[in-house]
Curated annotation (Swiss-Prot):
Keywords: Chaperone, Cytoplasm, Nickel, Nickel insertion. GO terms for cellular component: cytoplasm. HAMAP family: UreE. This is Urease accessory protein UreE. It is found in: Cytoplasm. Its main location: cytoplasm. GO terms for biological process: protein folding; protein-containing complex assembly; urea metabolic process. InterPro entries: UreE, UreE_C_dom, UreE_N, UreE_N_sf.
Length: 158
């Protein structure tokens, strides 16, 4: 079993691992990337165990280091989502406001919003005049205002 206990710095930093050191890439859904304690089997046949600091939320393209130095890359797995677009920025902002009031996991982009399928929310958004499309796509919801603080606290401990 390969046990992963450490998230490495993002790829754009000098301390990121070179691509040739990555054992394999692992596709995980948005929900799976929120689990800090997790066991699964990879498509390559490896038994994996995540023992990451509590509260860790993995992002697309993150790297993890195993107890024996193995490195894997996490990739956002395409999954069922609804993508919201609007004829105006104001209307898209209103949609983000209403979804935020409902504490919905939400991916925010300048041209669209993306969330997990929900028929009640879909009807509300369509009622507001937004275009709602069901699709299969990587889902990268915002991690929230306090995740950055959590990462800083973990760095201070390490």
């Amino acid at each position: 079993m390969l046990t992963f206990t450490e998230r490495l710095p993002p790829r754009h930093t000098a301390s990121s691992p070179p691509p040739e050191t990555v054992l394999f890439s692992l596709l995980l859904t948005a929900e799976e990337r929120t689990r800090s304690r997790y066991r699964l089997d990879s498509p390559e046949g490896f038994s994996l165990c995540f023992r990451l600091p509590r509260g860790t939320i993995l992002q697309d393209r993150d790297f993890l280091r195993g107890e024996n130095g193995e490195i894997i890359q996490i990739i956002a797995k395409p999954e069922p989502v609804i993508t919201i677009t609007a004829p105006s920025t104001d209307l898209l902002l209103k949609a983000a406001y209403h979804l935020g009031n409902r504490h919905v996991a939400l991916e925010i982009n300048p041209d669209y919003l993306r969330l997990a399928p929900d028929s009640v929310l879909q009807a509300m958004l369509e009622g507001l005049g937004l275009a709602v499309n069901e699709e299969i796509a990587p889902f990268n919801p915002e991690i929230g205002a306090y995740q950055h603080y959590h990462d800083l606290e973990e760095a201070k401990k390490g």
